[in-house]
């Protein structure tokens, strides 16, 4: 089966910092060569201090967000503590693996801060997961994003530095990937809070890159 018509373009990135993590995406949604939306949401909050980025089929991604959010809340109610990032990733991995013969066309980043510190995991449509110790990118614009991330990431970055790096990586990807574009959505997660940056602040930071 030719899956090309089911695949949707996107660029999302994740950056691991000393005091938290940064998740970011652009906001263009496409159907083939048609721009279906310029305000698509691709970074979701799935627990108090855990977020997820989605690339691929919008419907599949939204179903997975609902699933993992509910399971995370049920776990918290039963055990009076939050699931770890690895635990949430394992839950998602098992669900994707069970559906391998009817795969959900998604590529995900799950990241946040738990009792073990900041962390990010990447998952593919078959449920394969990799712990990312520094940087990660998904979607059709990821090759361009990785060029920036690999070149400018350094050890011991703070989230303030990491968010500028994430914005730069997405910004550069939108220049060459026609399926990525429009505004940039940025989330910063520290041990204190899950914070989605104001769009005007992101625009101001992005303007400095031109």
UniProtKB/Swiss-Prot annotation:
The 20S proteasome core is composed of 14 alpha and 14 beta subunits that assemble into four stacked heptameric rings, resulting in a barrel-shaped structure. The two inner rings, each composed of seven catalytic beta subunits, are sandwiched by two outer rings, each composed of seven alpha subunits. The catalytic chamber with the active sites is on the inside of the barrel. Has a gated structure, the ends of the cylinder being occluded by the N-termini of the alpha-subunits. Is capped at one or both ends by the proteasome regulatory ATPase, PAN. GO terms for cellular component: cytoplasm; proteasome core complex, beta-subunit complex. Component of the proteasome core, a large protease complex with broad specificity involved in protein degradation. Its main location: cytoplasm. The active site is at residue 10. This is Proteasome subunit beta. It comes from Methanosarcina thermophila. Pfam families: Proteasome (PF00227). GO terms for biological process: proteasomal protein catabolic process. One of its GO terms (molecular function) is threonine-type endopeptidase activity. It is found in: Cytoplasm. The keyword Hydrolase applies.
């Amino acid at each position: 089966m030719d899956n090309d018509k089911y695949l949707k373009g996107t660029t999302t990135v994740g950056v691991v910092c000393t005091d938290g993590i940064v998740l970011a995406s652009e906001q263009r949604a496409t159907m083939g060569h048609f721009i279906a939306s310029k305000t698509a949401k691709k970074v979701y909050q799935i627990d108090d201090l855990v977020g997820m980025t989605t690339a691929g089929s919008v419907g599949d991604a939204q179903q997975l967000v609902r699933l993992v959010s509910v399971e995370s809340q049920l776990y918290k109610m039963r055990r009076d503590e939050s699931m770890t990032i690895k635990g949430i990733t394992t839950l998602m991995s098992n669900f994707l693996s069970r559906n391998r013969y009817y795969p959900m066309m998604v590529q995900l980043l799950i990241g946040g801060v738990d009792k073990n510190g900041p962390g990010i995991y990447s998952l593919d449509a078959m449920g394969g997961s990799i712990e990312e110790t520094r940087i990660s990118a998904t979607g059709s614009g990821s090759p361009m994003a990785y060029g920036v991330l690999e070149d400018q990431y350094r050890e011991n970055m703070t989230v303030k530095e990491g968010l500028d790096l994430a914005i730069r990586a997405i910004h550069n990807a939108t220049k060459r990937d026609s399926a990525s574009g429009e505004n940039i959505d940025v989330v910063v997660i520290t041990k204190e809070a899950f914070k989605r940056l104001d769009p005007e602040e992101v625009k101001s930071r992005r303007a400095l890159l031109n």
